[in-house]
């Protein structure tokens, strides 16, 4: 069930509620979300919130904020997560060929059963900033930094820096190159949620953490829109 508002003087919002489909329970496995965006001249701001509830092990069809049954590099016990919520705010400002962004998010994951290590709410606070320079209408250069801190039974920090370039061959096709470096400190959970291990370097949504505190990634690609 979703409602998207008209645009009122640069402001637009959207509300969504998804039923869990569990017989005899209205709220079980449900998802609630909302978002708003405002644009005025070179300034754009946005905020969003999502809450998803699982009453059992995450699997196909559950209200899972990640891929079903997958392991996120920052947190290995996805299948044991019950309710989770994420709040996010961001702002963007454009000056000539430059576009600057800043953002912050707070994510809270609660276990549906208490494990030896993952036995209470885990909170991830993330802040980031990025800058884009449009060299020509066809060439863009980007740089960014992201900081994440986890608290709860785990205690880890993650620093990630990245640089990229995009070349627009046409309105449909873009070539891109990305280089990134991540470094982690502290401790997090193992995949079973039963023990504490050293945090590993993790870049974006690669879904493959390093076996050491640091990770480097270089990505070359092409995108085509249809």
Tell where the protein language model's regions lie, with residue ranges.
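Short loop/turn motifs that connect adjacent beta-strands in outer-membrane beta-barrel proteins
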Residues: 9-10, 138, 171-172
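Short alpha-helix boundary/capping motifs
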Residues: 31, 64, 192-194
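Predominantly the C-terminal beta-signal and adjacent terminal strand-loop region
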Residues: 171-219, 225
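Short, surface-exposed, polar/charged, turn-prone segments marking secondary-structure boundaries
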Residues: 22, 41-43, 65, 170-173, ...
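Detector for outer-membrane/organellar transmembrane beta-barrel domains
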Residues: 37-167, 178-181, 213, 224
């Amino acid at each position: 069930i979703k409602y998207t508002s008209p645009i009122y003087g640069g402001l637009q919002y959207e509300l969504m509620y998804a039923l869990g489909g569990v017989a005899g329970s209205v709220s079980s496995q449900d998802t609630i979300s909302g978002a708003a965006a405002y644009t005025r001249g070179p300034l754009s701001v946005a905020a969003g919130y999502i809450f998803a509830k699982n009453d059992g092990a995450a699997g196909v069809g559950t209200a899972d904020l990640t891929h079903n049954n997958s392991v996120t590099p920052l947190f290995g016990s996805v299948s044991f997560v019950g309710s989770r919520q994420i709040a996010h705010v961001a702002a963007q400002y454009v000056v000539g060929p430059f576009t600057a962004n800043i953002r912050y998010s707070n994510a809270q994951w609660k276990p549906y059963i208490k494990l030896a290590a993952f036995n209470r709410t885990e909170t991830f606070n993330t802040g980031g900033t990025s800058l884009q320079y449009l060299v020509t209408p066809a060439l863009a250069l980007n740089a960014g930094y992201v900081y994440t801190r986890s608290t709860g039974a785990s205690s880890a920090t993650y620093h990630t820096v990245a640089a990229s370039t995009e070349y627009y061959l046409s309105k449909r096709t873009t070539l891109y190159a990305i280089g990134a470096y991540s470094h982690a400190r502290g401790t997090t959970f193992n995949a079973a949620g039963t023990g504490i291990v050293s945090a590993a370097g993790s870049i974006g949504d690669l879904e493959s953490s390093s076996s050491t505190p640091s990770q480097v990634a270089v990505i070359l690609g092409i995108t085509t829109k249809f």
